[in-house]
Every structure is written in C-alpha cells, then in structure tokens.
C-alpha cells in the first residue's frame, strides 16, 4: 500500500497524516494486519522509527525519526512532556441523568459542557476488559491530565446533544482522551470501547422530514477523534516546529450538517496557555 500523506519531511524526521483504521506498529496477536511502520520500512528503510503512537482508529499527525540521534532527542521530549499536542473530537453529551452515573460528570447548570474544563484522573489497565483502560479514583493507575475546550455545541431535533471539543493532553497515556471524555459524561462519537454504540449520527437524525434509506450510513462512521497538531523542538535547529493534519473530509461533512440542522451555540475563546 502507498504511504499516507506526508505532512513534513527533512533529513531528521518525517510526519505522516495517518488515516483512521491503520495500526501504527505491528499487531501483537495478528502480524498480518497492515500497519504504518511496515509501510514506512518498505518504502524508506528500517532506520525510520516512530516517536509515539496513535490508536488505530485515530487519524492525524504521526511523527517518525530518521536517525538514532533524532530518535533520542525527540523521544526525550515526549518523555519529559515538552511537546504540544492538540486533538479534536466530536462527542455525545449524555443527558444529565445518564451522565450522573459516570465517574466524574462535568456539566453547566443548563446541562451542557462548559466552555473549558480539565480532567485530572489516573488511568490504568482494566483487568476485567483486556485491551481497555479505566479510571482509578484513589489508588492505582498513573497520573493523567487533559485540558478541554468546547468549540461548538449542537442539539439534534430529538434533543440529543453533541459538542465539538479541542483536547490538549498534558500526559500521554493509552486511550487517555477517550477515557477522560467518557468519564466526564461526553464519550467520543463512534468509540466502540468507551462510547455509546447505539448513537450513530445520521442525516435523518438531524434533518426534519428526511427519511433515510434502510441502508443509510452514519455521517461519521469511525472514531470521531483526530490528532490535529503536534509541536516539537526540531532536532537540529532547536526551534519549535509545528505540524498540522487537515481535518478529514468525513469530519467536515458531519460538522456541516450539525451546523446547518442542529441548534447550536459556538464558543470562540483564547486557547489555554502553553506549558
């Protein structure tokens, strides 16, 4: 298979726009599954190594190093949390009575997500569900912190609420954004592990009087999480370097119809301060 689009490349590093559904590295149990690093090694040689990972279902910026010195320098930034990562997610805002059953529901008095909020909950492996993570309220797990900003809010004709959210993980745990949003009562649309599988955003859910066909597909038939931006210090210039992955077409379509048919209230504010 051809390589995903290259967002940036020089002699020290290369950034790809990873599509949803593609593993970053070989699967532990099924070595035959297609993965990005297998494609990269076949096309660019085995000296290229990924600095970090994205979930298979998450799209967006994936950075690789082209040499051992670059790998060590960039990996050190991730380990010391000196990178800036921005994700975007379309979330299902659970009704208040349903949200109260989750770990740490976050709501305004009107029952919507606040303009900005922070989730500070430790995460660890969910032994009852292999391959998944869970929140640890008191003991156990590893410290985990995420800042969120609500960019837009939407209400479908049936009353179901959605929100377009900017996510800034300040730690880098497995499934961090997915678990933190679910814990806040706003699981990511299309999340088969931590979400609400019965909620599938279709045009017929938004457009009054429109009756879709029996085989109508969701507007966004995937995990609605995209790694939009990654900023690191360049291995050679030592200057901050930002890489941006454009929003996938299916996100643009879903947002277009939500803005057109969903009663919403946008929010434009300053980004949280850099750290």
Spell out what each predicted region is:
Residues 1-275:
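RNA pseudouridine synthases
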């Amino acid at each position: 298979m051809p390589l995903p689009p290259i967002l940036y490349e020089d002699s020290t590093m290369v950034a790809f726009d990873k599509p949803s559904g593609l593993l970053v590295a070989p699967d532990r149990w099924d070595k035959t599954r297609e993965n990005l690093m297998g494609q990269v090694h076949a096309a660019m040689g085995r000296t290229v190594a990924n600095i970090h990972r994205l979930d298979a279902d998450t799209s967006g910026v994936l950075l690789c190093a082209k040499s051992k010195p670059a790998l060590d320098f960039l990996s050190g930034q991730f380990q010391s949390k000196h990178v800036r990562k921005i994700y975007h997610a379309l979330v299902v805002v659970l009704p208040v009575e349903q949200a109260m059953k989750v770990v740490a529901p976050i709501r305004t008095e009107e029952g919507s997500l606040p303009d900005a909020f922070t989730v500070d909950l430790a995460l660890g492996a969910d032994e009852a569900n292999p391959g998944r993570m869970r929140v640890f309220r008191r003991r156990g797990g590893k410290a985990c912190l995420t800042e969120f900003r609500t960019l837009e809010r939407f209400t479908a004709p049936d009353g179901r609420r959605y929100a377009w959210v900017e996510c800034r993980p300040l730690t880098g745990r497995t499934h961090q954004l997915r678990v933190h949003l679910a814990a806040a009562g706003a699981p990511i649309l299309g999340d088969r592990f931590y979400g609400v599988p019965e909620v599938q955003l279709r045009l017929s859910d938004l457009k009054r009087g429109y009756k879709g066909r029996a085989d109508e597909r969701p507007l966004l038939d995937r995990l609605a999480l995209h790694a939009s931006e990654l900023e690191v210090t360049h291995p050679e210039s030592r200057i901050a370097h930002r890489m941006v992955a454009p929003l996938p077409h299916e996100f643009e379509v879903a947002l277009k119809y939500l803005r057109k048919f969903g009663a919403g209230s946008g929010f434009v504010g300053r980004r949280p301060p850099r750290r």
